[in-house]
């Protein structure tokens, strides 16, 4: 080997060896052997800015659930296929990620949180108390075609009440839906409600009850594919004349008609008054008593495509973003646990589409794209010390502020950039002590000057980063300024 060429060790994942001549490096293996970093189609990574916004949304709705007496649970991502698919239709099975594990068991990833919840109730029935009100926020998977706003992996946010079949539990779920949207700052929305029982009675009069599941799934597409396409698909299984009548049931009256007018219309089509229409009237009266009925409309076209719904059903739309689709939907399912236990347990619940709702909140300007957890960051200014910065941050934390300290004295523009990327609006500069008076260099323990009780009088500069405006004050006055300056 030539004296001016030296063989050096290297990283085996990159190359077997490298030859160095002066400052040039030549690798003996191609870099194309590196694995390309990418996610599966229909799946996503979430950067901190995205995950923070989602975490804040989850925190808000979780507080609403807890305040209404709902408790958290969790279930496995994988279930036996027979547990998930026993009550499903062929369309659902096509969307399920299903496979045999190493032990030859037929298993599948959960496609929603309701079916696993029914299994959970049956398996732990003796350990639970009823009515049992739970919330569950977790990922689900569906193998549908990826498109804008639709993914194969996404988070569902479910809340249900089981063990009581009465108008109040139906109302309670609707009230929580209303409260969650209000807590998120949404004011312009409508919750569309209907009842599967009324629609099934109507189909029975048309002698189509044995085809109800197929018809329900087609009618459920009305808002997506339009009246003409729905009539065309219905005609294939019900005939043209009956297809027209079915669509007329769902859209025969103006959406501006009042609740009782629409209810009387579908009640007549279904053959008269019955427990299902009585339930709708009772629920609506409870909504009126609570002073929230103005955000609810009776919409017979709402059917929900899933098989297990048997009673009241509902979907929620943001009035200013109708193209977004439903952001919260659900209904009553009286027969779901009957698949897993002899005694059936009646239940009612809803699911919030977190990702879709978050996208809508961003479009409406309700959620900032620069949302962050931290109230303020302590910048490391030349001439100061990390000990004074750390002590000041500890003082603010004891005052209830969420504070971060920049760890090293980099250029101030770099520190600004760091804060802005994390969505931090406020920056804090701790004024250095006069030259010769700083005891930070003392080697033995924490000096008296840094005791937390003495930090309150530290002179500081508080900077509002979006506007670059700056205020001189004492550290003890910072908490009030941060709280008063929050947008």
Q: For each of these PLM feature ranges, what is it?
A:
Residues 5, 16-18:
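Short hydrophobic alpha-helical segments enriched in small aliphatic residues
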Residues 31-51:
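Auxiliary tRNA-acceptor-end handling modules of aminoacyl-tRNA synthetases
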Residues 32, 53-68, 79-82, 103-104, ...:
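Positively charged, Gly/Ser-enriched RNA/tRNA-binding surfaces
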Residues 151-157, 193-201:
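Short, conserved phosphate-binding/catalytic loop or strand-edge motifs used
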């Amino acid at each position: 080997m030539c004296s001016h060429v030296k063989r050096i060790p290297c990283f085996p994942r990159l190359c077997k060896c490298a030859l160095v001549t002066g400052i040039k490096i030549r690798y003996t293996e191609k870099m194309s052997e590196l694995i390309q970093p990418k996610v599966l189609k229909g799946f996503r990574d979430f950067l901190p800015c995205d995950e923070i916004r989602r975490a804040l949304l989850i925190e808000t709705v979780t507080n609403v659930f807890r305040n209404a007496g709902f408790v958290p649970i969790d279930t496995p991502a994988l279930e036996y296929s027979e547990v998930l698919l026993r009550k499903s239709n062929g369309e659902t099975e096509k969307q399920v990620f299903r496979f045999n594990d190493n032990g030859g068991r037929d298993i599948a990833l959960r496609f929603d949180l309701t079916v696993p919840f029914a299994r959970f109730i049956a398996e732990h029935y003796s350990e639970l108390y009823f009515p049992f009100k739970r919330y569950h926020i977790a990922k689900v998977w569906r193998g549908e075609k990826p498109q804008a706003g639709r993914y194969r992996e996404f988070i569902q946010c479910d809340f249900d009440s089981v063990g009581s079949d009465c108008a109040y539990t139906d109302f309670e779920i609707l009230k929580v839906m209303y409260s969650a949207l209000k807590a998120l700052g949404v004011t312009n929305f409508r919750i569309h409600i209907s009842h599967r029982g009324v629609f099934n009675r109507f189909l029975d009069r048309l002698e189509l009850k044995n085809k109800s599941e197929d018809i329900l799934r087609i009618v459920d597409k009305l808002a997506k594919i339009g009246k003409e396409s729905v009539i065309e698909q219905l005609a294939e299984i019900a005939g043209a004349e009956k297809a027209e009548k079915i669509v007329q049931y769902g859209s025969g009256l103006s959406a501006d008609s009042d609740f009782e007018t629409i209810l009387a219309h579908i009640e007549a089509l279904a053959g008269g008054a019955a427990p299902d229409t009585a339930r709708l009237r009772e629920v609506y009266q409870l909504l009126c008593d609570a002073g929230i009925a103005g955000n609810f409309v009776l919409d017979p076209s709402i059917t929900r495509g899933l098989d297990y719904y048997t009673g009241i059903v509902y979907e929620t739309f943001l009035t200013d973003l109708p193209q977004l689709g439903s952001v919260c939907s659900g209904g009553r399912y009286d027969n779901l646990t009957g698949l897993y236990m002899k005694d059936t347990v009646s239940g009612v619940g809803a699911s919030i589409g977190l990702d879709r709702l978050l996208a809508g909140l961003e479009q409406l300007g309700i959620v900032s794209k620069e949302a962050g957890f931290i109230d303020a960051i302590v910048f490391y200014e030349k001439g100061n010390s990390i000990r004074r910065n750390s002590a000041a941050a500890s003082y603010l934390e004891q005052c209830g502020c969420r504070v971060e300290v920049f760890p090293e004295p980099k250029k101030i523009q770099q520190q600004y950039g760091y804060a802005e990327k994390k969505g931090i609006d406020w920056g804090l500069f701790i004024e250095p002590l006069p030259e010769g008076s700083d005891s930070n260099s003392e080697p033995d323990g924490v000096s008296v000057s840094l005791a937390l009780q003495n930090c309150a009088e530290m002179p500081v500069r508080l900077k509002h980063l979006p506007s670059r405006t700056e205020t001189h004050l004492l550290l003890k006055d910072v908490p009030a300024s941060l709280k008063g300056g929050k947008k």
